[in-house]
């Protein structure tokens, strides 16, 4: 599977925003560059301030915490990128027309596992913000629902027509799949549970759990 590091992608896609002050723009550009080069956890705010040519206190006047600085960077990027990322993901997963739904699900889990291993720190912070920040939920959820949820519903309906999946509302089945996969990855990457070194065994366990709820019997 191809690599896709969000911080590196953000660095390559530097954006300017006319609504930002010059100092805030410099802080955000410096943060993207340093996060991509050194990793989020290895980049102190003092180093961001030095690279941006501002006092460290200036960062905290614009962003309450380093986490909030990252969120201010990643949310606009995700809103721009989710449509294309979703399109490319589903095109890749469905390129084998003879694939059954169970294999589709297995490949989806493998792909997203690799993606999250490359973006663990970002995933941890975004999940935390989803729990506690209603504004972030309202900003991102419509993009997730429109670009990922709707595609998953279409896939489910196609496999229902082939007789592989139960004749139940596709939207409800999509929620079951989405929350099962999301829960699996949150337990693994945020809470450090499901920490088996045998990732294929973890994937197979998740596939069996999901298929038990959607398989045509």
Regions from the PLM with identified roles:
Residues 27-35, 112, 210:
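Short hydrophobic clusters on alpha-helical segments that form packing/core surfaces
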Residues 1-22:
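N-terminal intrinsically disordered/low-complexity leader segments
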Residues 85-94, 115-136, 184-189:
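Amphipathic alpha-helical segments used for helix-helix packing
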Residues 138, 160-208:
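Hydrophobic/aromatic-rich alpha-helical bundle segments in the mid-to-C-terminal region
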Residues 75-81, 86:
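Short, basic, alpha-helical segments at the C-terminal edge of helix-turn-helix-like DNA-binding modules
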Residues 87-118, 174-177:
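Hydrophobic alpha-helical connector segments
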Residues 103, 114-118, 125-127, 134-162, ...:
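Amphipathic alpha-helical packing segments from all-alpha helical-bundle domains
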Residues 26, 34-68, 72:
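Helix-turn-helix
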């Amino acid at each position: 599977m191809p690599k896709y590091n969000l911080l590196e992608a953000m660095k390559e896609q530097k954006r300017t925003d006319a609504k930002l002050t010059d100092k805030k723009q410099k802080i955000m550009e410096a943060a993207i560059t340093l996060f991509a080069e050194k990793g989020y956890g290895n980049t102190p705010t003092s180093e961001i301030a030095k690279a941006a040519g501002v006092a460290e206190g200036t960062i905290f006047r614009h962003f309450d915490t380093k986490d909030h600085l990252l969120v201010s960077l990643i949310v606009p990027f995700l809103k721009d990128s989710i449509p294309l990322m979703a399109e490319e993901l589903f095109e890749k997963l469905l390129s084998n027309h003879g694939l059954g739904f169970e294999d589709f699900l297995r490949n989806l889990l493998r792909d997203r596992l690799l993606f999250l291993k490359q973006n663990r720190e970002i995933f941890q912070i975004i999940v935390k913000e989803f729990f506690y920040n209603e504004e972030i939920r309202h900003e991102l959820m419509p993009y997730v629902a429109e670009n990922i949820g709707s595609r998953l519903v279409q896939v489910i309906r196609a496999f229902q027509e082939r007789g592989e999946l139960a004749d139940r509302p596709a939207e409800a089945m999509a929620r079951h799949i989405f929350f099962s996969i999301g829960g699996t990855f949150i337990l693994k990457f945020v809470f450090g549970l499901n920490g088996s070194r045998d990732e294929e065994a973890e994937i197979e366990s998740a596939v069996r759990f999901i298929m038990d709820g959607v398989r045509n019997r």
